[in-house]
Regions:
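PLP-dependent class I/II
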Residues: 1-224
């Protein structure tokens, strides 16, 4: 995303979340957001790669800040909510529908993740009619999709999805793997936040020397 944005003259601002804060947005990111002047905000929920699910309270607080900043600067701020892992949430975690709380939201969704169809590049955008200049946003998304080409799903897969649209992946299998990996990694001295969603773990090695860690992995013929 960063490269494409910079090519159009955009400035990309990154914010590093901290593992010791459980990658939570409320502690430091929301105050940071309240100070920044932005045109758009990109959010991945559940998060890739930490697996954190941002709850309703966090989304509401974020929406309130964005609405306040829209009034302050007299301009629209677009929240791009990337939600390809929406159905992959564990332990009762609920992924909020951001469009309920913030009008100028575009939602990105991918069946490649929710139905375990990697590489098929098929999904959809939600562009609410309530958002500012929704018709222009829709047209821009349509043109961008045609120009990129690489993300155009073939007609066969579009027909397949039509028949599978209400299907779900085996969440129990993902959850079983999540629990096994988490407990095993912690047992061997690694540290990570147990993911609430998606199928990733953001793991910190017990050895902070990267080169030494790689050499140890090579001894056991591991590909990381």
């Amino acid at each position: 995303y960063s490269l494409a944005l910079r090519r159009t003259g955009c400035e990309v601002v990154r914010f590093a979340l901290k593992q010791e804060e459980n990658f939570d947005l409320r502690e430091n990111f929301l105050p940071f957001l309240a100070r920044e002047k932005i045109d758009a905000l990109f959010l991945c929920n559940p998060n890739n790669p930490t697996g954190v699910v941002y709850d309703e309270a966090t989304i509401k607080a974020m929406a309130a800040i964005l609405e306040k900043k829209e009034k302050e600067f007299g301009t629209s701020i677009v929240l791009i909510s990337d939600e390809p892992y929406r159905e992959l949430a564990y332990d009762g975690a609920v992924v909020p529908y951001v469009t309920k709380y913030y009008r100028n939201t575009v939602v990105c969704y991918s069946y490649s993740k929710s139905l375990s169809l990697p590489g098929e590049r098929i999904g959809y955008l939600v562009i609410p009619s309530e958002m500012d200049e929704s018709a222009n946003v829709f047209q821009a998304a349509t043109i961008a999709n045609r120009v990129l080409g690489c993300v155009n799903a073939p007609s066969l897969m579009q027909r397949v999805i039509k028949r599978c649209i209400h299907e779900k992946v085996n969440l129990e299998a993902y959850d079983r793997n999540r629990n096994l990996l988490y407990s095993s990694l912690c047992e061997y001295g690694f540290s990570c936040i147990k993911p609430e969603g998606a199928f990733y773990m953001w793991v910190k090695s017990p050895d902070e020397d990267e080169d030494r860690f790689v050499e140890q992995a090579k001894k056991y013929h591991l590909i990381l």
